[in-house]
Amino acid sequence: MLNSNTKDHEDLRIYQIIDANLDRAREGLRVLEDWARFGLGKEKYVEKIKNFRQILGKNHLEVYKQSRNQIEDNCKGLTHQEQLNRKTSEQIISSNSARVQEALRVIEEFSRLHNNELSKIASEIRYEIYTVEIDLLSFSKFKKSEKILKENDLYVITDQKDNLLEIIEEILIAGVKIIQHRFKTGTDQDHLQEAIEIKNLCKRYNSLFIVNDRLDIALASNADGIHLGQDDLDLKTTRKLFGYSKIIGISANNAIDISNALDEGCDYIGIGPVFETTTKKNKKPLGIENIKTLTKDLNIPWFAIGGIKSNNISYLKRNGFKKVALVSELMNSEDPKEDAMMILKELSHEN
């Protein structure tokens, strides 16, 4: 409750400070709430943020509102250049989270003088917003990666090449948006350095960088995702360690593999081999009809893999296959940029 231990003029100044910062905090919360609702579809966070906003609204007393017009504010309308430089949803989330946190800190400090209840409320919400900010940023990053995954039909897997970085850049220039890196020979230090270099290339071209199998390398290189085989670390543990802003894909060869992958919450599935392939010599080809049966009810992205070449993509397309993963076709190409462009064109062609 309010008390009258301070002088009237000082009270007015303090009320004005609290009023301005309650407005700032509530406005910033509204921005976060709307992004959680319309941008991310996260009902849990919408309810949580709305509750914070309503609590502050309930404590926005009339005495605070009345103070705003009683002392002239010569700094009204001041802006900063950084406010004009926000170009992404992440920047908007970060700036408005900071706006809320800073406003709540001011409220917490000044309301201690006469309204301990409001000070406590501001402190509790401020600490909650630190976590909300991190979660919203993670969800937003995942949303972008998920969008790339859904909208792009060519998934390129690397092979060991002396000029690997050159090949990767050529296919990225061509328009490839998903790269999975497989490790073969070399030390872990070599693998990490190579992963970081490929990650930087993918970032430059707004493409996803996915690491095959190695969670440690994926974490250390800040990869966008990881692809797991049936004998790798389980998805639940991987998700816990890797985080919810990252893409996790699973290899599948049968209905049980697919069912388990869906139950565990994977983001995409690689299904195959479709045809005979030198990269999976011990795997019997599934064939077109078998894969069509396996995938008829799949509602997440899936990529056909195994023995896929530029000369059989049109055949796959005619059979309803939309997304494919390639290895040797581009890794062994004499002109990876041109071949990647041709394959992308073929995949975009409506049969």
Curated annotation (Swiss-Prot):
UniProt entry tagged with the keyword Oxidoreductase: no
Region of interest: Thiamine-phosphate synthase: 129-351
Disulfide pattern: none
Function per UniProt: Condenses 4-methyl-5-(beta-hydroxyethyl)thiazole monophosphate (THZ-P) and 2-methyl-4-amino-5-hydroxymethyl pyrimidine pyrophosphate (HMP-PP) to form thiamine monophosphate (TMP).
UniProt catalytic activity: 2-[(2R,5Z)-2-carboxy-4-methylthiazol-5(2H)-ylidene]ethyl phosphate + 4-amino-2-methyl-5-(diphosphooxymethyl)pyrimidine + 2 H(+) = thiamine phosphate + CO2 + diphosphate; 2-(2-carboxy-4-methylthiazol-5-yl)ethyl phosphate + 4-amino-2-methyl-5-(diphosphooxymethyl)pyrimidine + 2 H(+) = thiamine phosphate + CO2 + diphosphate; 4-methyl-5-(2-phosphooxyethyl)-thiazole + 4-amino-2-methyl-5-(diphosphooxymethyl)pyrimidine + H(+) = thiamine phosphate + diphosphate
Domain of life, per lineage: Bacteria
Species for this entry: Prochlorococcus marinus (strain AS9601)
Binding-site residues for Mg(2+), renumbered to this chain: D213, D232
Name of the molecule in the record: Thiamine-phosphate synthase
InterPro entries attached to this UniProt entry: Aldolase_TIM, ThiamineP_synth_sf, ThiamineP_synth_TenI, ThiD2, TMP_synthase, TMP_synthase_cyanobac_bac
Region (Unknown): 1-128
Binding site for 4-amino-2-methyl-5-(diphosphooxymethyl)pyrimidine: Q180, H181, R182, F183, K184, N212, S251, K280
Family: Belongs to the thiamine-phosphate synthase family.
